[in-house]
Amino acid sequence: MHEIQLKNYEITGILGTGADYEVRSAVALDTGETVVLKRPIPQVITRDMHAPIEARTESIIETYRDLFESTNTLCPLIGYTSKCNHNELYNDGIMQNYTVLVFERAPGIPLVGDARSRILRIPIGIPQNLFTLYPLFQLDDSSCWSVQAALLETERKFFESGRILLDLGPQNIHYQPATGQITIIDLGDQVMVGDEKVGNRGRKRDIYDFYIEILKYYTISADPPKSIDGYKEPHGLRPVIGLDQEMNEMIRTVESPEVSCNKLKINMINKIKDFEYDDFSHFMVDLTEYLQEVRIRYRDNPELASYQAIWFESLQLLKADHWRKYDFEAETELSKFDK
Protein backbone atom coordinates (compact mmCIF):
# COMPACT_ATOMS: atom_id res chain seq x y z
CA MET A 1 0.00 0.00 0.00
CA HIS A 2 1.48 3.31 -1.06
CA GLU A 3 0.65 6.77 -2.40
CA ILE A 4 -0.53 6.56 -6.00
CA GLN A 5 -0.55 8.89 -9.00
CA LEU A 6 -3.85 8.60 -10.87
CA LYS A 7 -2.22 9.60 -14.17
CA ASN A 8 -1.40 5.88 -14.47
CA TYR A 9 -5.09 4.96 -14.67
CA GLU A 10 -8.02 5.32 -17.03
CA ILE A 11 -11.63 5.13 -15.84
CA THR A 12 -13.69 2.42 -17.56
CA GLY A 13 -17.09 2.71 -15.88
CA ILE A 14 -19.24 3.56 -12.87
CA LEU A 15 -19.87 0.66 -10.50
CA GLY A 16 -22.20 2.42 -8.09
CA THR A 17 -22.70 5.01 -5.38
CA GLY A 18 -23.08 4.30 -1.67
CA ALA A 19 -23.87 6.49 1.30
CA ASP A 20 -20.44 8.17 1.22
CA TYR A 21 -18.47 7.00 -1.80
CA GLU A 22 -18.74 6.88 -5.55
CA VAL A 23 -17.16 3.72 -6.98
CA ARG A 24 -15.68 3.42 -10.47
CA SER A 25 -13.74 0.79 -12.35
CA ALA A 26 -10.44 1.71 -13.93
CA VAL A 27 -7.51 0.11 -15.67
CA ALA A 28 -3.79 0.60 -15.04
CA LEU A 29 -2.31 1.85 -18.31
CA ASP A 30 1.07 0.23 -17.73
CA THR A 31 -0.06 -3.24 -16.59
CA GLY A 32 -3.66 -3.56 -17.79
CA GLU A 33 -4.73 -4.43 -14.23
CA THR A 34 -8.39 -3.70 -13.45
CA VAL A 35 -8.86 -1.73 -10.24
CA VAL A 36 -11.62 -0.01 -8.28
CA LEU A 37 -11.53 3.70 -7.42
CA LYS A 38 -13.45 5.13 -4.46
CA ARG A 39 -13.89 8.83 -3.84
CA PRO A 40 -16.38 10.92 -1.83
CA ILE A 41 -19.72 11.43 -3.56
CA PRO A 42 -19.19 14.25 -6.11
CA GLN A 43 -22.21 16.28 -4.97
CA VAL A 44 -20.82 16.31 -1.44
CA ILE A 45 -17.39 17.38 -2.69
CA THR A 46 -18.77 20.30 -4.69
CA ARG A 47 -20.57 21.58 -1.58
CA ASP A 48 -17.35 21.35 0.45
CA MET A 49 -19.11 18.98 2.85
CA HIS A 50 -16.81 15.99 2.41
CA ALA A 51 -14.57 16.51 5.47
CA PRO A 52 -16.31 13.70 7.44
CA ILE A 53 -15.81 11.33 4.49
CA GLU A 54 -12.15 12.31 4.28
CA ALA A 55 -11.83 11.45 7.97
CA ARG A 56 -13.42 8.08 7.25
CA THR A 57 -10.96 7.56 4.39
CA GLU A 58 -8.04 8.22 6.75
CA SER A 59 -9.52 5.70 9.17
CA ILE A 60 -9.76 3.08 6.41
CA ILE A 61 -6.11 3.62 5.45
CA GLU A 62 -5.05 3.31 9.09
CA THR A 63 -7.05 0.10 9.47
CA TYR A 64 -5.29 -1.44 6.48
CA ARG A 65 -1.92 -0.52 7.95
CA ASP A 66 -2.82 -2.19 11.24
CA LEU A 67 -4.85 -5.23 10.23
CA PHE A 68 -4.43 -6.22 6.59
CA GLU A 69 -1.48 -8.54 7.19
CA SER A 70 -3.31 -10.43 9.95
CA THR A 71 -6.51 -11.08 8.01
CA ASN A 72 -7.35 -12.77 4.72
CA THR A 73 -10.80 -11.28 4.20
CA LEU A 74 -10.14 -7.62 3.34
CA CYS A 75 -10.14 -6.50 -0.28
CA PRO A 76 -6.53 -5.43 -0.92
CA LEU A 77 -5.95 -1.68 -0.90
CA ILE A 78 -3.33 -0.94 -3.54
CA GLY A 79 -2.92 2.62 -2.38
CA TYR A 80 -4.33 6.09 -2.07
CA THR A 81 -3.75 9.50 -3.58
CA SER A 82 -2.68 12.67 -1.90
CA LYS A 83 -5.54 15.02 -1.05
CA CYS A 84 -5.66 17.08 -4.22
CA ASN A 85 -7.64 17.93 -7.34
CA HIS A 86 -8.39 14.94 -9.59
CA ASN A 87 -10.17 16.66 -12.46
CA GLU A 88 -7.54 15.42 -14.91
CA LEU A 89 -8.76 11.85 -14.42
CA TYR A 90 -12.45 12.35 -13.71
CA ASN A 91 -12.90 15.29 -16.11
CA ASP A 92 -15.97 16.52 -14.24
CA GLY A 93 -14.97 20.07 -13.37
CA ILE A 94 -14.67 19.38 -9.65
CA MET A 95 -11.79 21.53 -8.44
CA GLN A 96 -11.91 20.76 -4.71
CA ASN A 97 -9.25 18.58 -3.10
CA TYR A 98 -10.06 15.04 -1.95
CA THR A 99 -8.51 11.59 -1.56
CA VAL A 100 -9.10 8.62 -3.87
CA LEU A 101 -8.67 5.03 -2.69
CA VAL A 102 -7.43 2.44 -5.19
CA PHE A 103 -8.43 -1.18 -4.52
CA GLU A 104 -7.85 -4.46 -6.26
CA ARG A 105 -10.95 -5.84 -7.89
CA ALA A 106 -12.71 -8.12 -5.40
CA PRO A 107 -12.83 -11.76 -6.57
CA GLY A 108 -16.11 -13.65 -6.70
CA ILE A 109 -19.68 -12.40 -6.60
CA PRO A 110 -21.49 -10.28 -4.01
CA LEU A 111 -23.69 -12.32 -1.71
CA VAL A 112 -26.44 -9.90 -2.71
CA GLY A 113 -26.22 -8.16 -6.06
CA ASP A 114 -26.79 -4.51 -6.92
CA ALA A 115 -30.35 -3.54 -5.95
CA ARG A 116 -30.75 -1.69 -9.25
CA SER A 117 -30.50 -5.03 -11.05
CA ARG A 118 -33.90 -5.94 -9.65
CA ILE A 119 -35.39 -3.71 -12.33
CA LEU A 120 -34.00 -6.19 -14.84
CA ARG A 121 -35.51 -9.07 -12.83
CA ILE A 122 -32.09 -10.35 -11.79
CA PRO A 123 -32.36 -12.74 -8.79
CA ILE A 124 -29.90 -10.76 -6.68
CA GLY A 125 -30.41 -12.85 -3.54
CA ILE A 126 -29.29 -16.17 -5.04
CA PRO A 127 -25.73 -16.22 -3.56
CA GLN A 128 -26.86 -15.27 -0.05
CA ASN A 129 -29.50 -17.99 0.04
CA LEU A 130 -27.36 -20.71 -1.57
CA PHE A 131 -24.16 -20.21 0.39
CA THR A 132 -25.06 -18.63 3.74
CA LEU A 133 -28.64 -19.53 4.68
CA TYR A 134 -29.20 -22.90 3.01
CA PRO A 135 -25.74 -24.41 2.30
CA LEU A 136 -27.17 -27.79 1.37
CA PHE A 137 -24.11 -28.77 -0.67
CA GLN A 138 -21.97 -29.68 2.35
CA LEU A 139 -23.78 -30.83 5.45
CA ASP A 140 -21.24 -33.38 6.72
CA ASP A 141 -19.29 -30.83 8.74
CA SER A 142 -19.31 -27.19 9.83
CA SER A 143 -17.43 -26.00 6.72
CA CYS A 144 -20.82 -25.22 5.21
CA TRP A 145 -20.85 -22.12 7.44
CA SER A 146 -17.59 -20.70 6.07
CA VAL A 147 -19.06 -17.22 5.56
CA GLN A 148 -20.22 -16.87 9.15
CA ALA A 149 -16.94 -18.29 10.47
CA ALA A 150 -14.88 -15.83 8.42
CA LEU A 151 -16.98 -12.86 9.54
CA LEU A 152 -16.66 -13.88 13.19
CA GLU A 153 -12.89 -14.30 12.92
CA THR A 154 -12.51 -10.96 11.13
CA GLU A 155 -14.60 -9.13 13.72
CA ARG A 156 -12.63 -10.79 16.52
CA LYS A 157 -9.40 -9.36 15.12
CA PHE A 158 -10.97 -5.92 14.70
CA PHE A 159 -12.34 -6.02 18.24
CA GLU A 160 -8.98 -7.04 19.69
CA SER A 161 -7.42 -4.06 17.88
CA GLY A 162 -9.94 -1.69 19.49
CA ARG A 163 -12.28 -1.44 16.52
CA ILE A 164 -15.80 -2.60 15.70
CA LEU A 165 -16.48 -3.18 12.01
CA LEU A 166 -20.13 -2.71 11.01
CA ASP A 167 -22.20 -2.64 7.82
CA LEU A 168 -21.25 -6.24 7.04
CA GLY A 169 -24.40 -6.93 5.08
CA PRO A 170 -24.26 -9.37 2.15
CA GLN A 171 -24.03 -6.58 -0.42
CA ASN A 172 -20.60 -5.75 1.03
CA ILE A 173 -19.27 -9.31 0.96
CA HIS A 174 -17.94 -11.04 -2.17
CA TYR A 175 -17.84 -14.83 -2.19
CA GLN A 176 -15.86 -17.41 -4.15
CA PRO A 177 -17.89 -20.66 -4.31
CA ALA A 178 -14.89 -22.77 -5.33
CA THR A 179 -12.95 -21.99 -2.15
CA GLY A 180 -15.55 -20.63 0.26
CA GLN A 181 -13.39 -17.51 0.65
CA ILE A 182 -15.02 -14.14 1.37
CA THR A 183 -13.76 -10.64 0.60
CA ILE A 184 -15.04 -7.62 2.52
CA ILE A 185 -15.23 -4.63 0.20
CA ASP A 186 -16.25 -1.84 2.58
CA LEU A 187 -14.52 -0.87 5.84
CA GLY A 188 -16.15 2.55 6.02
CA ASP A 189 -18.37 1.93 9.03
CA GLN A 190 -16.14 1.50 12.07
CA VAL A 191 -16.57 2.38 15.72
CA MET A 192 -13.66 2.55 18.14
CA VAL A 193 -14.07 0.47 21.29
CA GLY A 194 -14.51 2.85 24.21
CA ASP A 195 -15.54 5.64 21.86
CA GLU A 196 -18.89 4.21 20.78
CA LYS A 197 -21.08 6.85 19.16
CA VAL A 198 -24.78 7.44 19.63
CA GLY A 199 -26.70 6.32 16.55
CA ASN A 200 -29.79 7.79 14.95
CA ARG A 201 -32.06 6.18 17.53
CA GLY A 202 -30.33 7.28 20.70
CA ARG A 203 -28.35 4.11 21.56
CA LYS A 204 -24.60 3.96 21.27
CA ARG A 205 -23.45 1.77 18.40
CA ASP A 206 -21.28 -1.01 19.77
CA ILE A 207 -20.41 -4.69 19.36
CA TYR A 208 -24.08 -5.60 19.82
CA ASP A 209 -24.75 -4.01 16.43
CA PHE A 210 -22.43 -6.60 14.93
CA TYR A 211 -24.31 -9.38 16.70
CA ILE A 212 -27.56 -8.03 15.26
CA GLU A 213 -26.11 -7.93 11.75
CA ILE A 214 -24.95 -11.55 11.94
CA LEU A 215 -28.34 -12.84 13.07
CA LYS A 216 -30.23 -10.58 10.67
CA TYR A 217 -28.29 -11.32 7.47
CA TYR A 218 -26.71 -14.72 8.04
CA THR A 219 -29.27 -16.82 9.90
CA ILE A 220 -32.83 -17.81 9.07
CA SER A 221 -35.44 -19.79 10.98
CA ALA A 222 -37.13 -21.65 8.15
CA ASP A 223 -36.85 -24.86 6.18
CA PRO A 224 -35.06 -24.67 2.81
CA PRO A 225 -37.12 -23.35 -0.12
CA LYS A 226 -39.33 -25.78 -2.00
CA SER A 227 -38.99 -23.87 -5.27
CA ILE A 228 -36.35 -21.88 -7.12
CA ASP A 229 -38.27 -18.67 -6.42
CA GLY A 230 -37.48 -19.12 -2.73
CA TYR A 231 -33.79 -18.58 -3.47
CA LYS A 232 -34.12 -15.42 -5.54
CA GLU A 233 -34.91 -12.69 -3.03
CA PRO A 234 -32.35 -11.36 -0.53
CA HIS A 235 -32.93 -11.87 3.17
CA GLY A 236 -32.87 -9.23 5.90
CA LEU A 237 -32.05 -6.16 3.81
CA ARG A 238 -34.59 -3.90 5.47
CA PRO A 239 -32.57 -1.23 7.31
CA VAL A 240 -31.73 -2.05 10.91
CA ILE A 241 -34.24 -0.42 13.25
CA GLY A 242 -33.94 -0.02 17.02
CA LEU A 243 -32.41 -2.93 18.91
CA ASP A 244 -35.59 -3.95 20.72
CA GLN A 245 -37.74 -3.71 17.60
CA GLU A 246 -35.17 -5.64 15.59
CA MET A 247 -34.96 -8.42 18.15
CA ASN A 248 -38.74 -8.63 18.54
CA GLU A 249 -39.09 -8.89 14.76
CA MET A 250 -36.56 -11.73 14.67
CA ILE A 251 -38.42 -13.64 17.37
CA ARG A 252 -41.71 -13.07 15.56
CA THR A 253 -40.36 -14.63 12.37
CA VAL A 254 -38.92 -17.74 14.03
CA GLU A 255 -40.79 -20.73 12.65
CA SER A 256 -41.32 -23.70 15.00
CA PRO A 257 -39.82 -22.07 18.13
CA GLU A 258 -39.96 -25.43 19.91
CA VAL A 259 -37.26 -26.87 17.60
CA SER A 260 -33.88 -27.10 19.35
CA CYS A 261 -31.96 -24.87 16.94
CA ASN A 262 -34.64 -22.19 17.10
CA LYS A 263 -34.60 -22.31 20.90
CA LEU A 264 -30.89 -21.53 20.70
CA LYS A 265 -31.53 -18.60 18.36
CA ILE A 266 -34.22 -17.16 20.62
CA ASN A 267 -31.79 -17.49 23.53
CA MET A 268 -29.17 -15.48 21.59
CA ILE A 269 -31.73 -12.82 20.72
CA ASN A 270 -32.75 -12.45 24.35
CA LYS A 271 -29.11 -12.20 25.43
CA ILE A 272 -28.59 -9.39 22.92
CA LYS A 273 -31.73 -7.59 24.11
CA ASP A 274 -30.51 -7.81 27.70
CA PHE A 275 -26.84 -7.00 26.86
CA GLU A 276 -25.69 -10.26 28.44
CA TYR A 277 -22.71 -10.96 26.16
CA ASP A 278 -19.89 -9.63 28.32
CA ASP A 279 -17.27 -11.25 26.09
CA PHE A 280 -17.10 -11.57 22.30
CA SER A 281 -16.11 -15.22 22.58
CA HIS A 282 -19.39 -16.05 24.31
CA PHE A 283 -21.34 -14.90 21.27
CA MET A 284 -19.03 -16.93 19.02
CA VAL A 285 -19.69 -20.05 21.09
CA ASP A 286 -23.47 -19.56 21.03
CA LEU A 287 -23.60 -18.86 17.29
CA THR A 288 -21.40 -21.87 16.52
CA GLU A 289 -23.65 -24.12 18.60
CA TYR A 290 -26.74 -22.74 16.88
CA LEU A 291 -25.31 -23.25 13.38
CA GLN A 292 -24.30 -26.79 14.29
CA GLU A 293 -27.91 -27.55 15.23
CA VAL A 294 -29.20 -25.99 12.01
CA ARG A 295 -26.75 -28.09 9.97
CA ILE A 296 -27.90 -31.29 11.68
CA ARG A 297 -31.54 -30.34 11.15
CA TYR A 298 -30.95 -29.82 7.43
CA ARG A 299 -28.89 -33.01 7.14
CA ASP A 300 -31.44 -35.20 8.90
CA ASN A 301 -34.49 -33.80 7.14
CA PRO A 302 -36.29 -36.71 5.40
CA GLU A 303 -36.94 -34.41 2.43
CA LEU A 304 -33.28 -33.46 2.02
CA ALA A 305 -32.91 -35.02 -1.45
CA SER A 306 -35.84 -32.96 -2.72
CA TYR A 307 -34.48 -29.78 -1.14
CA GLN A 308 -31.03 -30.43 -2.63
CA ALA A 309 -32.51 -30.89 -6.10
CA ILE A 310 -34.05 -27.40 -5.86
CA TRP A 311 -30.75 -26.07 -4.51
CA PHE A 312 -28.82 -27.39 -7.54
CA GLU A 313 -31.42 -26.00 -9.94
CA SER A 314 -31.09 -22.61 -8.29
CA LEU A 315 -27.30 -22.81 -8.54
CA GLN A 316 -27.59 -22.82 -12.33
CA LEU A 317 -28.91 -19.24 -12.21
CA LEU A 318 -25.38 -18.10 -11.38
CA LYS A 319 -24.34 -19.10 -14.90
CA ALA A 320 -26.37 -16.21 -16.34
CA ASP A 321 -24.52 -13.41 -18.11
CA HIS A 322 -25.30 -10.94 -15.31
CA TRP A 323 -22.80 -12.52 -12.95
CA ARG A 324 -19.99 -12.34 -15.51
CA LYS A 325 -19.58 -8.62 -14.85
CA TYR A 326 -17.85 -9.61 -11.61
CA ASP A 327 -14.50 -11.39 -11.29
CA PHE A 328 -16.30 -14.71 -11.57
CA GLU A 329 -16.01 -17.60 -14.01
CA ALA A 330 -19.09 -19.71 -13.36
CA GLU A 331 -17.82 -22.89 -14.99
CA THR A 332 -14.71 -22.89 -12.81
CA GLU A 333 -16.24 -21.60 -9.58
CA LEU A 334 -19.22 -23.96 -9.66
CA SER A 335 -17.49 -27.09 -10.96
CA LYS A 336 -17.09 -28.60 -7.50
CA PHE A 337 -20.88 -28.81 -7.25
CA ASP A 338 -21.23 -30.89 -10.41
CA LYS A 339 -23.08 -34.10 -9.71
Regions found by a protein language model. Give the residues of each.
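Terminal C-lobe "cap" of eukaryotic-type protein kinase domains
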Residues: 271-297
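ATP-binding glycine-rich loop module of kinase domains
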Residues: 20-73
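C-lobe/activation-segment region of protein kinase-like
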Residues: 182-265, 282
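ATP-binding glycine-rich phosphate-binding loop
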Residues: 3-30
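Conserved structural core of kinase catalytic domains
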Residues: 76-139
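Catalytic-loop of the protein kinase fold
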Residues: 155-176
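Regulatory extensions appended to serine/threonine kinase catalytic cores
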Residues: 295-339
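Activation segment signature within eukaryotic-like protein kinase domains
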Residues: 147-148
